[in-house]
Amino acid sequence: LKFIELANEIAHQNTVLLQTTMGAVAVTEQAIVNEAHRRGMIVPGRKYRDKQAEPVTAAGAYVATPKKGLHDWIGSIDINSLYPSVIRALNMGPETIVGQLRPIITSAEVNRAKSQKKSFAAAWDNQFGSWEYQAVMNKEKGTEVLVDWTDGTSVRMSAAQLYDVVFEANNKWMLSANGTIFTYEFEAIIPGLLKRWYAERKEMQRKMHDAGDNEIEKEYWDKRQLVKKINLNSLYGAILNPGCRFFDMRIGQSVTLTGRCITKHMGAKVNEIIGGKYDHVGQSIIYGDTDSVY
């Protein structure tokens, strides 16, 4: 499989030591630093991390309960690069966060589930966004939310009012399913890096295809497109690792919960097309996992 050649290519493309390629965090971190420097920007120093603090956990991907039995004519729909696409779609980056819905209701619901001896993952079963986010998207006038802005101020308003502030006013803002508000006035570094990696991989795949019967050239481009694939698939997990310089729970959970909403909609729409009912656990859906439905 030529792992040493692959590791060498990863090291050169991301300017890290060969031994650093054995993990994803340091490689991804250096790639983001390189992208910032390419834009003429300076990256802030690493934040102090209290090793004695309790580990933080983000809500994971949606995994449906499979419908048991022998099924005929099964089809699958898979979203291409779900997590990188979510990061790009909402322009997620530490520098584009405008505010955060304080998860008061969400924390209460999760703690209530834990008091019933449920796991953290079980507390999020059939929940496709924070409770505050759902209230905003439902334009609930009777539900009050608290927004913590990045300038240090906080404001209370109804969920319906916040919907208008984010989506109806002239603010260039987007709201993730985690209740994190991002601006799209400028492109964040991480989404820009993902965009470049994705475009470069497509170009390398094209050159690999155009190589025809030239096996040496095909192998050359195949190795390089594989590096881009590894970079793309590694980034989300790396930035959700507390050891990463760019770790931010708001971004990590924004990715997973927004991904949940997309997968839920995909399953519900597929069931509607086949069975006539918009329902993500409808009769036509037998399973779903992270970025796919069956």
Could you say what each language-model-derived stretch is?
Residues 1-94, 100-101, 107-108, 112-114, ...:
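Common nucleic-acid-contacting/processivity interface regions adjacent to the catalytic cores
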Residues 34, 94-186, 191-192:
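Charge-dense polyanion-binding interfaces
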Residues 166-244:
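Active-site cores of enzymes that catalyze phosphoryl transfer or operate on phosphate-rich substrates
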Residues 2, 6-12, 37-41, 88, ...:
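Generic surface-pattern signal
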Residues 201, 232, 282-294:
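Catalytic palm active-site di-aspartate
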Residues 271-281:
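Short secondary-structure junctions
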